[in-house]
């Protein structure tokens, strides 16, 4: 049930009846922010009345006469200067909420299926994942879940950094050190590889001969040298294994089969360069192959040049990104491509899109979206780091969250078994970390706060999870079979019941907004609001001890729909529920 969509159809018919023109693009229907303004507000009539040269008061009254909401609204009010406030009919609300109880998928209307590629997480090989990867990973995963839930064909793309200069440096360092060559015959930790990388980078920056050697190894890799490809694969496999452990722990739906890293496109790069040359987009400049973009200018005011092949024959990240876009459009046939990557990549990404578009690789109908993410900050307002000033490893963050959750649960439930404490602590800690990320507008920076994250009050995962445990407890005490609930319709008597039911009916329009904007904080705000409304309902409306059997079943039914909605919403965030806390 999508109330906004339902009302828009009614409005469209009314406008056609009044004006013979829809003026539909000028109309907005939104949820009212204050109860005195009803449940929904229609905006846009002022603009239409001006176009028709009719006084707004006269046009608004005429509009109300033509909009057919007799069974839907008990009151329709004109609010100056020209807004229409709609107060929904309680009986209509009851009918719709009863329909949701019987419907599958919470009554959500499936979307017209599109193929949507979501590029997220994308850690670099030979480095441990750190807190900087968290936002892209959890936000991208949540949006993938939401779009799949709506019926879209979602392709999860983990575009890992498994190619390029860093591998030339690593291989050069390994080849020049007998001790490191020996270690390649054993299973080594990713932290050891990262140490190799740091040492290689130091040497690369100060030793021109080592830097030249590293670049030569990059070329050998790109040309398919078997020996160096074997070393490269070993490095990649260790990294993937470690990253998959993090994904499993975070309940992220990224599998090894979702990895389409930079190396995947290597064999396509010669054809990309050749094609761009043939189309007159790429030219030779100082020995390199360059695409000049007229919309971008350097400091001298001349068109900015994007190098796609160096004079030594090596390819660049920009070449890979162009090949990647072509593959997603021409092979995967994407209708929409969403990138959850660093904001610092914005210009680079847009330039690659422009080149791909000029080359004819992107259909006009394809939506390209770069959803930038803000930064995770410490209490000092600076990027969240360790005391030593290094980026905090994601594993370290998860370990600390687990320990904090374990202590919290033990303080509330001292008699719980150790295994139960660990199980609860894992679910609560992961939920708290993910929700803390997902509940913030992805564009803004935010300050990381352990105390707020694990708080059982406010817009947090524990608060929403606790609402679920309350409902579990109600049904455990009531021992009512589902067939009894099916036989009884929901009857809304109190304001608490009505407000809860309306919020439940707004689930679909919220999910559609999340899918369109790629913004899971909208879902978090909804789940928090629903939890608050359920708490008010729980405190003010006796359920098991209701004044008659019909009201008891009605309220149990309303509680069950609430639990289904909360569980579904949390699952779309990648967060699990618990039966007790």
UniProtKB/Swiss-Prot annotation:
It is an enzyme of class 6 (ligase). InterPro entries: aa-tRNA-synth_I_CS (IPR001412), Arg-tRNA-ligase (IPR001278), Arg-tRNA-synth_N (IPR005148), Arg-tRNA-synth_N_sf (IPR036695), ArgRS_core (IPR035684), DALR_anticod-bd (IPR008909), Rossmann-like_a/b/a_fold (IPR014729), tRNAsynth_Ia_anticodon-bd (IPR009080). One of its GO terms (molecular function) is ATP binding. It catalyses: tRNA(Arg) + L-arginine + ATP = L-arginyl-tRNA(Arg) + AMP + diphosphate. Belongs to the class-I aminoacyl-tRNA synthetase family. Monomer. This is Arginine--tRNA ligase. It comes from Blochmanniella pennsylvanica (strain BPEN).
């Amino acid at each position: 049930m999508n109330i906004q969509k339902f009302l828009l159809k009614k409005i469209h018919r009314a406008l056609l009846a009044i004006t013979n023109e829809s003026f539909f693009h000028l109309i907005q229907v939104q949820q009212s922010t204050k109860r005195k303004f009803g449940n929904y507000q229609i905006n846009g009539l002022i603009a239409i009345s001006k176009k028709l040269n009719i006084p707004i008061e006269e046009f608004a009254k005429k509009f109300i006469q033509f909009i057919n909401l007799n069974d839907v609204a008990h009151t329709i009010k004109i609010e100056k200067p020209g807004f229409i406030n709609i107060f929904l009919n309680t009986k209509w609300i009851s009918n719709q909420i009863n329909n949701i109880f019987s419907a599958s998928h919470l009554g959500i209307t499936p979307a017209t299926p599109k193929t949507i590629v979501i590029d997220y997480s994308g850690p670099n090989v030979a480095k441990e994942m750190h807190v900087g990867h968290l936002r892209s990973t959890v936000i991208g995963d949540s949006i993938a879940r939401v779009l799949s839930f709506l019926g879209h064909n979602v392709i999860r793309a983990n575009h890992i950094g498994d190619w390029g200069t860093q591998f030339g440096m690593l291989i050069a360092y390994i080849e020049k050190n007998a001790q490191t060559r020996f270690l390649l015959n054993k299973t080594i930790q990713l932290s050891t590889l990262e140490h190799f990388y740091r040492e290689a980078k130091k040497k690369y920056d100060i030793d021109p001969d080592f830097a030249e050697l590293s670049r030569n190894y990059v070329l050998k890799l790109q040309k398919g040298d078997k020996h160096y490809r074997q070393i490269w694969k070993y490095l990649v496999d260790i990294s993937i294994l470690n990253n998959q452990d993090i994904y499993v722990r975070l309940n992220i739906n990224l599998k090894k089969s979702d990895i389409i890293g930079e190396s995947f496109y290597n064999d396509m790069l010669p054809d990309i360069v050749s094609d761009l040359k043939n189309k007159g987009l790429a030219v030779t400049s100082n020995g390199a192959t360059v695409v000049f973009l007229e919309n971008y200018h350097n400091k001298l005011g001349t068109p900015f040049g994007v190098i796609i092949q160096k004079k030594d024959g090596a390819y660049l990240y920009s070449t890979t990104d162009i090949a990647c876009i072509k593959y997603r459009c021409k092979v995967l046939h994407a209708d929409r491509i969403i990138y959850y990557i660093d904001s610092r990549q914005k210009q680079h990404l847009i330039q690659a899109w422009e080149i791909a578009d000029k080359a004819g690789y992107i259909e006009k109908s394809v939506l390209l979206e770069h959803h930038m993410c803000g930064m995770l900050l410490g209490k000092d307002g600076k990027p969240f780091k360790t005391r030593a000033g290094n980026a905090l490893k994601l594993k370290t963050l998860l370990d600390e969250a687990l320990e904090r959750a374990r202590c919290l649960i033990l303080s509330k439930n001292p008699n719980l078994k150790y295994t139960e404490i660990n199980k609860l602590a894992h679910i609560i800690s992961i939920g708290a970390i993910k929700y803390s990320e997902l509940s913030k507008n992805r564009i803004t920076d935010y300050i990381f706060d352990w105390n707020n994250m694990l708080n059982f009050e406010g817009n947090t995962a524990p608060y929403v999870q606790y609402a679920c445990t309350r409902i579990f407890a109600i049904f455990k005490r009531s021992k009512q079979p589902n067939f009894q609930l099916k036989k009884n319709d929901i009857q809304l008597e109190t304001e608490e019941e009505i407000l809860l039911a309306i919020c439940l009916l707004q689930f679909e329009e919220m999910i559609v907004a999340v899918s369109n904007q790629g913004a899971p904080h909208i879902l978090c705000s909804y789940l928090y609001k629903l939890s608050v409304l359920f708490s008010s309902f729980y405190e003010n409306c006796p359920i098991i001890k209701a004044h008659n059997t019909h009201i008891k079943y009605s309220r149990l039914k309303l509680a069950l729909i609430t639990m289904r909605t909360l569980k579904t919403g949390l699952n779309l965030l990648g967060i699990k529920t618990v039966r007790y806390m």
